[in-house]
Amino acid sequence: MAVKDRYMSKIKQETKPWIKRFGRLGYFAFGGVFILLGVLAFMTAAGAGRAKDSSGALQTLSRMPYGSLLLFFIGIGLIGYVIWMVLSAIKDTEGHGNSRRGLSRRIGNFFSAAVYTSIAWNALRFVFGQGDGGTSEQTWSAYVLAQPFGQWLTGLTGAGFIVFAIVQFMKGVRAAFMKEFDTSKMNKQMICITKNTGRAGNIARAIIFSAIGYFLIKTAMTADPDDTRGFDGALAELAQQPHGKLILSILALGLILYGMYAIMKGIYQHMTWEK
């Protein structure tokens, strides 16, 4: 216990206040992206469009009134989220430690930083009128399949998505994420709201990621990049199943709740190094 206290004390001394504020802003932007994805998925379920991934959602937002201004704040906010994730991976600013589980979470934060760097870049590209130049999942998978051991790499990536989905699902069911919140600053109603939104949101995200993993494994088995589905493709496939519109509506609500959960995490995240 004394060793851990000294470890957290070192983190507390090294973490600058502006970095923590920037990280909180990042969670707000992170949550905003998922709320936008959920709203667009709802529109798809209602027959008013097609499910979109983050790039498609940003493109839609760019065409709305004041969309460029919102995209600017999302882009800057996500840069804050990326910085926070990188620091969490390298400096362990969230105090995960050096155990096997702690290191796996820190590595996961590094990959999360890579993904949201791309989304932040796309958001700012739309702000400056240089968007709509993304590369499709099929193009990427075709490139990977053409490499030595490409099918194995694609299959392992799919398996990674499914493993992540299982972890995310269990995290939602058990409400294990509540350990990340400073509940001393929350009233009972806010704790209840956070727990329920976090549960629903994490489970919804797990279902979508498991679908993406399934299609990647299918791509590896058939060696056909057309079988690959990204975020939007996975939602579109789910919508085509029996009761698909109902399923998509539930997942859309889950994405919105996940966004709300992320915003609350930005407000109440339990930072043990804060005074």
Curated annotation (Swiss-Prot):
InterPro entries: DUF1206. Its main location: membrane. Pfam families: DUF1206. One of its GO terms (cellular component) is plasma membrane. It is found in: Cell membrane. Disulfide bonds: none annotated. It is a multi-pass membrane protein. The chain crosses the membrane at residues 25-45, 70-90, 107-127, 149-169, 203-223, 247-267. The keyword Zinc does not apply. The keyword Transmembrane helix applies. It comes from the Bacteria. Keywords: Cell membrane, Membrane, Transmembrane, Transmembrane helix. This is Uncharacterized protein YxxB. It comes from Bacillus subtilis (strain 168). The lineage of its organism: Bacteria, Bacillati, Bacillota, Bacilli, Bacillales.
